[in-house]
Amino acid sequence: MPGPASFFVTPIQVTVPNELTSEAELLKFFAVSAAELKKIWWFRSRMYQKFEISKGKGKKRLISAPDHRLKMLQTKIASSLAPIYRPRNPVHGFVDNRSVKTNATAHLRSKFIMNLDIEGFFSAITEGRVSGLMSALGIDGRVAEILARICCNEGVLPQGAPSSPIISNMICFRMDKQLQRIAKESRCIYTRYADDVTFSSYQPLTLLFEGPPPPAGNFSPDLLKDGLRGAFRSNGFAINPQKVHYADKHSRRTVTGLKINEIVNVDRKFVRNIRAALFVVEKQGAAVAQKTLKDKYGREAALASHLRGRISWVGHIKGPSDPIFRSLASRYNKLFPSEKLEILPTIVEIRERAVWVVEHWGGDATEGSVQGTAFFLKSVGLVTAWHCVDGATEIAVYHPSKPSNKFKVTVAKNDAHRDLAVLAHEIPATEYYEFDISKRTFKAGDNTTALGFPGFGPGDKINVRSGLITSLPIKSAVPMIEVAQKLSQGMSGGPLLDEDGAVAGINYKGGPSEARDFAVHVKALTDWLSVA
């Protein structure tokens, strides 16, 4: 295997943080004395607790967890290295705003998948390699030696130390560039999540193999092109021969444990295991379930925390409004009421409680009331069209499920030119949900949903009308959205939603007597409020 220095032929051009410029600055940053550093230097192995966790299929993963003092120093080192490291696009492990989900999403709808695993990933990164990395960054040699000593145990990078993730990514920086180039030349997608490497394409991954691609299933890494195997080898890593898998369009395709078909999804077996665990708690009690958990993982683990983490994972992958997540979370909340999971409302539930009837009376009582629609918008309040409340002496809003429970409101802000109004109210927050403001850039052909109460009468419910954006005109300097669906009288002031259920616009005018149907673009609202 090449020596540590050979991995970094030329120095890497970065700005070294002040705390890493000398031993004196480092000690000051650590808030430790030279004597204390000496103790850590010689007795660091005593500062780790080792234990195993289950990886499934009877396999175990060794975790080396540092004690509080050493963990604090490693966390400080990680924070100092963070501004230096600029992750490449294919890297998803241990990177802010990236995750197993983003890693899998990169391969969404690919028909051919190749999964590789780096053998002994953390243990392959030796103390000498870490010291060599630090020196290549331009860090003082003595400081590089100290950093490597604190971050490593028994001569290698320990799995369980807070500094190991970023250091491992920095060590892989050159390899990621090489694998990214190979993927580009082979016309496929490359990603890496820690030790999990994935290549995918819409076509067979022929250019990654010396011969034709193997049949779906596990295969020998010897079938891979020497250049691909060499990229791992030249960077001090080896491909795990037990974890090399190829999947074609007729087989099950997974990336970092997630299924990728039309959407990224959780394996059904994972969900079944959660349901089984909840069933044991429901029928036999927490004590029996706790014992089962200990027997499986070989150590004490809080049952509630274990289930909470797994159910939260389902919600992260499938979405907080997914019915499977909501069902699991609801069962969990009944069993562990003191540690409840938040169950967010679905898009349908939000729109059912976020859209209200607005009713106003003018100066002439003989004219009766005029009705329109209003809705609640996050960070804005209760929004409607100005023409729905223009000239009103009294305004009330109510939810159609409680027509007798009317709330008096007043106009807080209005813009007649844009036909917009924000209403001041004292409605309890428990009575309504709020929409998000859309962040999309719209174009003709995008799907929309208009909500409102046309010709509202007793017993009526919210009217939902689906359609497309037909054009995006600007009328008298006001951006508008023209839609295909009819916006009948009474829907004015209601929300026009995008495909995500966020507000794209405010219904303006339309109906059978109008040739065209318009909503005021939500940008007109946000621009107005930013200067109002």
Where are these regions (language model features)?
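Right-hand nucleic-acid polymerase module
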Residues: M1-I53, K60-R86, P90-L116, F121-S123, ...
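A generic structural motif
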Residues: D195-F199, L382-T384, D419-E426, I481-V483
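N-terminal activation segment of mature serine protease catalytic domains
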Residues: P337-F375, L382, E394, R418, ...
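Terminal peptide-recognition signature
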Residues: V358, A374, V380, T384, ...
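A structural micro-motif recognizing beta-strand termini
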Residues: E359-D364, H387, K402, L423-T430, ...
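Catalytic-histidine neighborhood of serine endopeptidases
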Residues: W361, G368-Q371, L377-D419, I427-P428, ...
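Flexible, gly/ser-rich surface segments that form the specificity/activation loops bordering the active-site cleft
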Residues: E431-M480, K486-S492, N507-F518
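C-terminal subregion of chymotrypsin/trypsin-like serine protease catalytic domains
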Residues: L497-A532
